[in-house]
């Protein structure tokens, strides 16, 4: 999961010239890989490429909601929260190596959630966690806070890492392409960002879920690729070639 964001950052910085916008805002959303489930900060720090990578960044604004009720109170400085962290940490450091522009990250993630229901823009059914609405509200609130501070901003991109749980949903796995298209169209509409870039992280065949469900993984991956190939503002970020976890193949 952690090396994944270096690929995203390098791809994005190659695709977009550094602009002199006062605050560059990046959005992060998805399920467990985005949330940072099963991460171990102490173990990561022992791996040479990530030495000191988890130190707080006081010059990066950060707003987050993860799981049921773990959230920041408005903007805070970017740091590891509890014992979990997602790709936002190394993304920010990779960004900082390339640019000194003001940076702000907004993240909403919850493990074990589906696009067909929990992230559905229409709210899903009565069992839905209503994460799309929660995410949009968080983004709008934080952007309003920037305005109150007299700052201008530009939403640069959304990093989306999700799909594992839709593999097990009889409707979700068959309609993932349509649901992802709808999700992207709606978020662009609701945030008034018709040209918003979307980076879609590949769901991996590694781990027990991927190894035991290769047919379903392929189904979701093909759906992701269909969206990428039809929208020049959507990019696919391969992850299956990366280590499943630090210290493991």
Short names for language-model regions:
Residues 1-2:
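N-terminal secretory signal peptides that target proteins for export/translocation
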Residues 5-16:
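Bacterial N-terminal signal peptides
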């Amino acid at each position: 999961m952690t090396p994944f964001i270096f690929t995203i950052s390098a791809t994005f910085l190659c695709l977009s010239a550094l602009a002199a916008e006062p605050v560059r805002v990046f959005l992060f959303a998805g399920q467990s890989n985005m949330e940072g489930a099963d991460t171990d900060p102490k173990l990561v720090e022992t791996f040479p490429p990530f030495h000191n990578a988890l130190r707080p960044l006081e010059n990066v604004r950060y707003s987050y909601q993860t799981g049921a009720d773990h959230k920041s109170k408005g903007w805070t400085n970017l740091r590891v929260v509890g014992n979990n962290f997602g790709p936002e940490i190394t993304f920010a450091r990779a960004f900082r190596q390339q640019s000194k522009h003001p940076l702000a990250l907004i993240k909403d993630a919850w493990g074990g959630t589906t696009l067909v229901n929990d992230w559905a823009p229409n709210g899903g059914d009565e069992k839905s966690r209503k994460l799309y609405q929660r995410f949009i509200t968080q983004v709008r609130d934080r952007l309003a806070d920037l305005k109150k501070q007299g700052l201008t901003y530009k939403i640069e991109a959304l990093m989306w890492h999700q799909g594992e749980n839709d593999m097990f949903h009889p409707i979700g796995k068959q309609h993932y392409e349509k649901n992802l298209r709808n999700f992207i169209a709606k978020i662009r509409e609701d945030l008034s960002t018709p040209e918003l870039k979307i980076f879609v992280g590949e769901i991996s065949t590694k781990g027990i879920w991927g190894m035991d469900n290769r047919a379903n993984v392929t189904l979701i991956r093909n759906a992701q690729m269909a969206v990428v190939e039809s929208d020049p503002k959507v990019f696919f970020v391969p992850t299956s070639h990366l280590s499943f976890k630090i210290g493991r193949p």
